[in-house]
Amino acid sequence: MPKSPPGIRLLRSLLRAGKQQRSMLSGIINGPMLQPKRKRARKAVQQPSKAKTEITASAIQARANARAGPTTVPGKWIASTYCARPLPASLPARRLAYWLYLPNHMPTATARRGSPMIVMLHGCHQSATQFAEGTRMNQLAEAKGYAVLYPQQSVTAQSQRCWQWYAESTQHGDGETALLAGLIESVCLQYAIDRQRIYACGISAGAGMAAVLALNHPEMIAAVGLHSGPVFGAARSQIEAVHVMRHGAGAPPEHAIRSLLLRRAA
């Protein structure tokens, strides 16, 4: 049976992640934010049995393996942190954790020009390593010889790890847009990346953030892939963002996109 084209395999990977993301989003919308927690009855303290201790140790090891990321692909799996330069008279510099996959094998033409790079933006309640595992993007990257960058939203910045695509400063190119653009530039300076072939891809809140990043930096992002994401300009606050997640966007995005392009041209 002939292999599916790379675009079809990418879509299938995102569909798998999309199923997981829908269950997570239902927890955000219908979960603790809208329903009070029930009080639990107190239970007597019991000493853990040997079997329970072994299960707990196994669970801890499993979580450690998840943080370590995919281990079945021969390329390099690099975990690091990007620290943005603070502007004068601004808040302390913000830090952004990220993971980077570099393929073990590259075609000769790719090696001469540098690796193409896909920036993968996870959804709410996800981590970068979970997104990498769920989409299997590293396996595809190894087969084709391109790098994959996985930024990870901080729980300090957003308690549910949602990218703040809805923030007005972010939509205008500041905030998390500037942070991600700075991270991409930093990675390009450290590794042999083909700057003409940098792509952004995301799911849910990550899709919204990928669209904002591409619209504000068309000179940096060659193309975008969006899955289950809000349209640009659909919300300007967290409350509006939750409404969009539940009911969709009412107004078409053309006006917001046109306004952004006019600001860039000015």
Model-assigned labels for residue ranges:
Residues 90, 109, 140, 189-192, ...:
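A general structural signal for stabilizing positions within well-ordered secondary structure
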Residues 95, 114-115, 145, 195, ...:
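A structure-centric signal for secondary-structure junctions around beta-strands
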